[in-house]
Amino acid sequence: MGVAGSGVLYFLFNNVPSPRFWLKKTQLIGTENPEGITGYECPYEYLRKSYGKHHWAAFVDKLSPNLQNEDPAKYRMVLETMDVIHLCLMMVDDISDGSEYRKGKPAAHKIYGAPETANRAYYRVTQILAQTATEFPRLSPWLMTDLRDILEGQDMSLVWRRDGVNGFPGTASERTAAYKRMVLLKTGGLFRLLGHLTLENNSMDEAFSTLGWHSQLQNDCKNVYSSEYAKMKGVVAEDLLNREMTYPIVLALDASGGHWVEAALKSPSRRNVGNALKIIQCDYVRDVCMAELARSGAPVKEWLKLWKREEKLDLKA
């Protein structure tokens, strides 16, 4: 191959966005007759096996130690509702992100297909809304309000992904404030829902908003700083590849070399992503992220023990 041909290949390899199939560890084949393996709610039940049925039980028990004995029907309803909302949001998120893996296993849509997985998520959410309205109508306003907040936050995130930096606030302080508002809606709303359904009041709103912010920070940081998390997802910096705003990315936009981050958000080529990742993993951005994790985690450390997220943040520039 001549010099010209080699130059063309070099340019394409480093500047054209990577096809996502290059990131797969294996080519996955859809399971035949999935209803015979995971039951009627196949994509949903498949994901629930990874997290465990009623995986919010420790939180509910801490919030209301006597609820299981005093009102077992409500106890089950709260746990089932939290499972449905949390897991179905993840099912749709994984489709939106083009994720290959979830918790080290193939994402549900890689097995059952995006149409079935998305429809199952919507169906299960609709089922739980109807069941709540019929069996526990006093919980319906809490559920509807918090679900609206969660989806509003998710919508903000998706609009930013679509519009890129041009649709994001211009100054560093405005960017951070806008990102935090989105997180407090999307992730904070999920934790507030837990408190609202269990206690039927808003006494835990402040603590659970903080817990939601900290939890999202953990996810954001693991995406670019954790080799263990990268192994489970099958790729480093999936958020950046998806042109998604996260706390490290927002900070890196205003760091030295931030133009590379902006370039990667506009066109996630190998060259742009590689250079942007160096900025995101630099000491300055990483130190600010670690400081915010420590600050936000301090007032909710007892709840974090129940959350059990301990991946090491070991990746640096």
UniProtKB/Swiss-Prot annotation:
Please name the top-level EC class of this enzyme.
Answer: transferase
Q: Which GO terms describe its molecular function?
A: metal ion binding; prenyltransferase activity
Task: Provide the alphabetized UniProt keywords.
Answer: Magnesium, Metal-binding, Transferase
Effect of knocking it out? Answer: Impairs the production of paxilline.
**EC code(s) of this entry:** 2.5.1.-
InterPro entries documented for this protein = Isoprenoid_synthase_dom_sf, Polyprenyl_synt
Q: Which Pfam families match?
A: polyprenyl_synt
Residues at which Mg(2+) 2 binds:
D93, D97
Copy the pathway line from the protein's UniProt record.
Answer: Secondary metabolite biosynthesis
Which GO biological process categories is it annotated with? paxilline biosynthetic process
> This protein's superkingdom?
Eukaryota
**Can you tell me which family this protein belongs to?**
Belongs to the FPP/GGPP synthase family.
What does it do?
Prenyl transferase; part of the gene cluster that mediates the biosynthesis of paxalline, a mycotoxin that acts as an inhibitor of mammalian maxi-K channels. PaxG, the geranylgeranyl diphosphate (GGPP) synthase is proposed to catalyze the first step in paxilline biosynthesis. Condensation of indole-3-glycerol phosphate with GGPP by paxC then forms 3-geranylgeranylindole (3-GGI), followed by epoxidation and cyclization of this intermediate (by paxM and paxB) to form paspaline.
Protein name per the record: Prenyl transferase paxC
From which source organism is this entry? Penicillium paxilli
